[in-house]
Curated annotation (Swiss-Prot):
GO terms for biological process: queuosine biosynthetic process; tRNA wobble guanine modification; tRNA-guanine transglycosylation. Residues 253-259, 277-281 are annotated as: RNA binding. The gene is tgt. It comes from Shouchella clausii (strain KSM-K16). PANTHER family: QUEUINE TRNA-RIBOSYLTRANSFERASE (PTHR46499:SF1). This is Queuine tRNA-ribosyltransferase.
Length: 383
């Protein structure tokens, strides 16, 4: 039986150790390292599937928790699965819903069986278990599914984190058993999630537990939750080597330009984040010269593009002054333009990262990019 998800290693950058590869899925092949736009409710906010294809998005992420609540998995099942429902014929990754249960619901009770919580929209009592998270994702029909994990708060003490890691490992085993029982493991790949916070011994314990289960891919969870960037990079330095070299490695919830480059240097293949779409709706844009808040008054008569060096449709067509006007008036078209540009910027950045790995010069690329973006300045504004 052919595995649903396989990883093909192409090259390691001699200068940085970053990996160039391909992830093969039932809906196509993805070049890595890569960034995944987030389509929480079966849509990347303000973008059409045609927009996403035009900017060369290879895969999108959707959210199990939100789709379970609205419209419900039964409606998506009637549509023929998530790909059919949203008219997207490329790969989809779905998260397990764990992060949302822990971040959106104030009233929750963690038991060995799963998590009891209240629907953040209606207040209705709900229960999500590893098995239920798998069953919903089977109906959604995503190419890559994520195991249901416990998402501990940051910071958390060692004893709390150890108990959490051990529960996540037991839940991962249950997820895998349910996935195999369903018979869907030939058409959907299930990734395990390594937890452990900033504790090296717990990351090692989590990685050992999960790699023993032989998932087709592995994610690093519990980062980008408020810790400083240098802590995240340090955790990646001791966690990534614990992950199999012949499987994809996914850093969850990371999407700032510096973190994408630094993550790739530390051996990560896949990234996702709501950052580019969320900040776009506030009029904040990523450009080759750094962060640009287009709603600011100084752009009222600025008829240049958002980014002189960007060749996206928005930068070729519209001015800062026009986009500022739209954003100030809360016109949806303005949010659409800034969203398109930000997503294009990150997808194009990852193309440049892949080329730099091919050319064995990713550290040189990082130095030049950081200098132009302004990351090297004292008190540099990040996202």
């Amino acid at each position: 039986m052919t595995a649903a998800i396989t990883y093909e290693h192409i090259k390691t950058c001699k200068q940085s150790g970053a990996r160039l590869g391909r992830v093969h899925t039932p809906h196509g092949t993805i070049e890595t390292p890569m960034f995944m736009p987030v389509g929480t409710l079966a849509t990347v906010k303000t973008m059409s599937p045609e927009d996403l294809k035009a900017m060369d998005a290879q895969i999108i992420l959707s959210n199990t928790y939100h789709l379970w609540l609205r419209p419900g998995e039964e409606i998506i099942k009637e549509a023929g699965g998530l790909h059919q429902f949203m008219n997207w014929d490329k790969p989809i990754l779905t998260d397990s819903g764990g992060f949302q249960v822990f971040s959106l619901s104030d009233l929750r009770k963690i038991t060995e069986e799963g998590v009891h919580f209240r629907n953040h929209l209606s207040g209705e009592k709900l229960f999500l278990s590893p098995e239920k998270a798998m069953q919903i994702q089977h109906v959604l029909g995503s190419d890559i599914m994520m195991a249901f994990d416990e998402c501990p708060p940051y910071p958390a003490d060692h004893s709390y984190m150890k108990a959490s890691v051990e529960r996540t490992s037991r839940w991962a085993e249950r997820c895998l058993a349910e996935h195999k029982r369903s018979g869907k493991d030939s058409v959907q790949g299930l990734f395990g999630i390594i937890q452990g916070g900033e504790y090296e011994d717990l990351r090692k314990q989590s990685a050992n537990d999960l790699t023993a289960l032989d998932f087709p891919g592995y994610a690093v969870g519990g980062l980008s939750v408020g810790e400083p960037k240098d802590v995240m990079n340090h955790v990646l330095e001791f966690t990534t080597p614990l992950m199999p070299e012949d499987k994809p490695r996914y850093l969850m919830g990371v999407g700032s330009p510096d973190s994408l480059i630094d993550g790739a240097i530390r051996g990560i293949d896949m990234f996702d984040c709501v950052l580019p779409t969320r900040i776009a709706r506030n009029g904040t844009c990523m450009t080759s010269a750094g962060r640009l808040v287009v709603r600011n008054a100084k752009y009222a008569r600025d008829f240049s593009p958002l980014d002189e060096k960007c060749d996206c449709h928005v930068c070729r067509t519209y001015s800062r002054a026009y986009i500022r006007h739209l954003i100030k008036c809360e016109e949806t078209f303005g949010f659409r333009l800034t969203t398109y540009h930000n997503l294009y910027f990150l997808l194009n950045l990852m193309k440049q990262v892949r080329q730099a790995i091919m050319d064995d010069c990713l550290l040189d690329f990082r130095e030049q990019f950081f200098e132009e973006y302004g990351f090297n300045k004292e008190n540099a504004r990040n996202f």
